[in-house]
A protein has these predicted regions:
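Conserved small/polar residues in nucleotide/adenosyl-binding loops
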Residues: 191-192
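N-terminal phosphate-binding or glycine-rich loops at protein starts, especially the Walker A/P-loop
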Residues: 4-37
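Glycine-rich nucleotide/cofactor/substrate-binding loop typically near the N-terminus or early
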Residues: 36-188
């Protein structure tokens, strides 16, 4: 590739073919980075005659010469990421050697998913037809600096403190505003 750095951007809220373009260019790249979004997005690739659907992993993951980076702007749902790695590993091979994830990525929690669902069902909010996967609420936490990030999982004390503080906020919202049952701490700590 002649360019030292190349960005592939979509300006139409998805479905422009960014993943296919990145896949095509990854043969000649050292690395490709997914810089934002969550597992609501998706791109379909054909690799060695097999259909692959990616949601969190950059499409460069199928190219053994390119590192695949997940940047700090991505909100990560651990279950979805692990399932995707498990599904793609037999096809792409050596994923963990090529995959790098920013420790500053926000982790999507069960309370994000619940809030997303409650907002979509509520008449008090203008619904936008989300995928109900907690992407928007996770970004709300990121912007308000209360998000649980990957790096927080390295310290059980810090992780539990952050989860307790954030869960108290969400439980107040669930109970007082939506009239719903509070989430138990164990319901959110399982993702780590």
């Amino acid at each position: 590739m002649k360019a030292k750095n190349l960005a592939v951007l979509g300006l139409q809220w998805g479905d422009e073919g960014k993943g296919k373009i990145v896949n095509f260019l990854s043969d000649r790249a050292d690395a490709a980075c997914r810089y934002q979004g969550g597992h609501n997005a998706g791109h379909t690739l054909i690799v060695n005659g097999k259909k692959i659907v990616l949601h969190l992993l950059p499409s460069s993951i199928c190219h053994k010469n390119a590192s695949s980076l997940i940047g700090r702007g991505v909100v990560v749902y651990c279950e979805a990421l692990f399932a995707e790695i498990e599904e793609i590993e037999p096809i792409a091979g050596g994923i963990m050697d090529r995959l790098k994830i920013s420790p500053a990525c926000t982790l999507i929690q069960p309370y994000h998913i619940l809030l997303d669902q409650l907002k979509e069902k509520s008449n008090s909010f203008n619904t936008i037809g989300t995928t109900l996967r907690g992407i928007g609420p996770a970004y709300e936490d990121k912007v308000s600096r209360k998000a649980v990030r990957i790096i927080d999982t390295l310290s059980e004390e810090k992780l539990n403190s952050k989860l307790e503080e954030t869960l108290a906020f969400y439980n107040f919202l669930f109970k007082e505003y939506f009239g719903k049952k509070e989430l138990d701490f164990n319901a959110v700590s399982y993702t780590h």
